[in-house]
């Protein structure tokens, strides 16, 4: 009888480990060391800022503040969805600025998560990156103050967008585009991409605070000004939330975006 109980307990623990809630990874992380490609030793990540943000099954990564010779200040971004299954971190690529052939592919990684760090070990493959090792250790990004109102926390997709002039979400250059916005305190990140053509348009990220009415963003990166001149800018937006949607307004009336919550 004891053996049966022990077996049942073991199976229960394995089942729990096999399919864990995606919220286990929620948070924002900054890479502190890596071992990519043909590297034989771990290298501190001190010449470029690399972040990875998780929230409720969605992820976004970005490289910016790049001090490496011959590189732009904003180097690129990627993202998609993820799941935790069979003890692995499984991610599917929805956009990838360095190589569009990675879009749609799924990769499985060993991982470890703690209150202070996220670790990831495995390989990816695409036309540009063949059987490419990706091993990284990231520190959790902590907030300077508590979040005042958590109503924005989660993943959102743009339904309407207007930025002044003739630009409209879903029309012209933005026809068939998706825009995802991820709030995972203390960061908010977002990306513009076309899932049909695998085109990546751009991404942005900021440290944020929300009091229930006003969203305040302190810019970290904004790919549409890839020289980094926008970093540190503080912007405030009027926010209206209702029935699983929010309206964001700013830029002296030039910006109006409507988002609906994912899932």
Regions found by a protein language model. Give the residues of each.
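Bacterial Sec-dependent N-terminal signal peptides
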Residues: 1-24
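A surface-exposed loop-and-adjacent beta-strand signature within N-terminal beta-sandwich domains
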Residues: 84, 88-90
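A generic structural signal for ordered secondary structure
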Residues: 6, 79-81
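Lipid interaction determinants
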Residues: 18-77, 90-203, 211, 216-263
């Amino acid at each position: 009888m004891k053996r049966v109980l022990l077996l049942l307990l073991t199976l229960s623990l394995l089942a729990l480990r096999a399919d864990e809630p995606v919220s286990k990874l929620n948070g924002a992380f900054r890479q502190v060391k890596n071992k990519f490609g043909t590297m034989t030793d771990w290298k501190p990540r001190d010449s470029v800022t690399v972040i990875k943000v998780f929230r409720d099954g969605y992820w976004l990564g970005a490289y910016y503040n790049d001090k490496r010779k011959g590189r732009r200040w904003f180097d690129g971004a990627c993202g998609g969805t993820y799941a935790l299954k069979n003890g692995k971190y499984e991610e599917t690529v929805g956009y990838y600025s360095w190589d569009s052939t990675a879009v749609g592919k799924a990769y499985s990684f060993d991982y470890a998560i703690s209150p202070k760090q996220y670790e990831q070990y495995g390989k990816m493959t695409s036309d540009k990156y063949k059987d490419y090792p990706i091993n990284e250790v990231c520190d959790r990004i902590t907030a300077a103050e508590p979040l005042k109102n958590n109503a924005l926390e989660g993943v959102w997709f743009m339904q309407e967008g207007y930025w002044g002039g003739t630009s409209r979400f879903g029309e012209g250059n933005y026809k068939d585009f998706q825009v995802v916005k991820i709030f995972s305190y203390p960061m908010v990140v977002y990306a513009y991409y076309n899932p049909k053509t695998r085109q990546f348009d751009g991404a942005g990220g900021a440290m944020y605070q929300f009091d229930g009415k006003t969203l305040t963003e302190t810019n970290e990166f904004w790919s549409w000004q890839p020289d980094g001149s926008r970093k540190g800018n503080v912007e405030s937006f009027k926010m209206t939330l209702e029935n699983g949607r929010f309206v964001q307004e700013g830029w002296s009336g030039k910006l109006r975006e409507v988002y609906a919550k994912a899932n």
